[in-house]
């Protein structure tokens, strides 16, 4: 359990309804300072509502929430001085350059980061003088992140940070997020990419129908929920063995194959993933 002094976010029995529809039905979790925390769930689960409450953009109906020791419902302006937000879609001026955009946002903060340092951190040094409208989709997301970081935030909210990225750009973004974590920045991540959450998050919470149905480290969730699968082909048929003891099962299979003179064709040992766990918890997601 994380000690109280080490918590960047504390949420207890948080509720929010829109008319007769309950978006959040008493969720509780804590985020430690300096960790990457992932909030996962299908569309309509309540993720956006929860994040907007924590950012100070939406009022809760009940329960308690503190972010960096502040109540986001009563101290939103003070809170926004200390957090950075990367929205899924942003509206930055297309006619400003990358450098001008960073300098403009730096002017909103009392103690901003050095603009050139931020531009280098997000990998846009060569695009410093390029206009926003000329940037690729991945470069615009890097600009969004730079704008979120220029105020020296203690906590950064990342909403679908790599949507639309090609594989190389996604990996580069992951390394950037890891570098932020190494600097002590707390990161609150929402993503539909389960491999991204597994790679980056120290802990995750799975939200469904306004309730948190599971939370913990990705390794803990995987260990609690899934077994390892061993697949091979024998006599033209695919055989799948599910086991909690893969070493023992594989040894028995190979010994049997050696004794009978059979080959374990197309042998594959498939470890469970966070995506497997997620789909078991919430089912197939539909858009």
Predicted features by range, described:
Residues 41-43, 84-85, 92-93, 219-220, ...:
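Short, charged/polar low-complexity linear motifs in solvent-exposed/disordered segments
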Residues 77, 113-116, 126, 219, ...:
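Generic alpha-helical secondary structure signal
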Residues 213-221:
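Charged, amphipathic alpha-helical segments
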Residues 1-5:
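Actinobacteria-biased recognition of intrinsically disordered, low-complexity terminal regions
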Residues 220-287:
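Short, charged/small-residue-rich alpha-helical element at the C-terminal edge
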Residues 6-11, 16-189, 194-208, 214:
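ABC transporter nucleotide-binding domains
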């Amino acid at each position: 359990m994380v000690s109280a002094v080490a918590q960047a976010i504390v949420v207890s029995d948080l509720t929010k309804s829109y008319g007769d529809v309950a978006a959040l039905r008493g969720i509780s979790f804590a985020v430690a300072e300096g960790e990457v925390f992932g909030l996962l769930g299908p569309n309509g689960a309540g993720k956006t509502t929860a994040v907007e409450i924590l950012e100070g953009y939406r009022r809760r109906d009940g329960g308690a929430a503190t972010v960096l020791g502040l109540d986001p419902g009563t101290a939103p302006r003070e809170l926004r001085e200390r957090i950075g937000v990367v929205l899924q879609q942003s509206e930055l001026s297309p006619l400003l350059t990358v450098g001008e955009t960073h300098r403009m946002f730096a002017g909103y903060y009392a103690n901003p980061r050095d603009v050139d340092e931020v531009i280098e951190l997000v990998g846009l040094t060569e695009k410093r003088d390029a206009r926003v409208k000329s940037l690729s989709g991945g470069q615009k997301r890097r600009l969004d992140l730079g704008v979120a970081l220029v105020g020296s935030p203690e906590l950064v909210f990342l909403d679908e940070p790599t949507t639309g990225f090609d594989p190389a750009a996604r990996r580069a973004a992951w390394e950037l997020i890891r570098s932020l974590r190494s600097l002590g920045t707390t990161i609150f991540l929402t993503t539909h990419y389960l491999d991204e959450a597994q790679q980056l998050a120290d802990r995750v919470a799975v939200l469904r129908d306004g309730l948190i149905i599971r939370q913990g480290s990705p390794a803990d969730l995987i260990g609690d929920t899934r077994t390892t699968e061993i697949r091979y082909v024998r006599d033209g048929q695919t055989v799948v063995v599910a086991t909690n003891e893969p070493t023992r099962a594989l040894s028995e299979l190979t010994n049997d194959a050696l004794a009978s003179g059979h080959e374990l064709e197309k042998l594959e040992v498939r470890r469970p993933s966070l995506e497997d766990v997620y789909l078991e918890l919430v089912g197939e997601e539909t858009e």
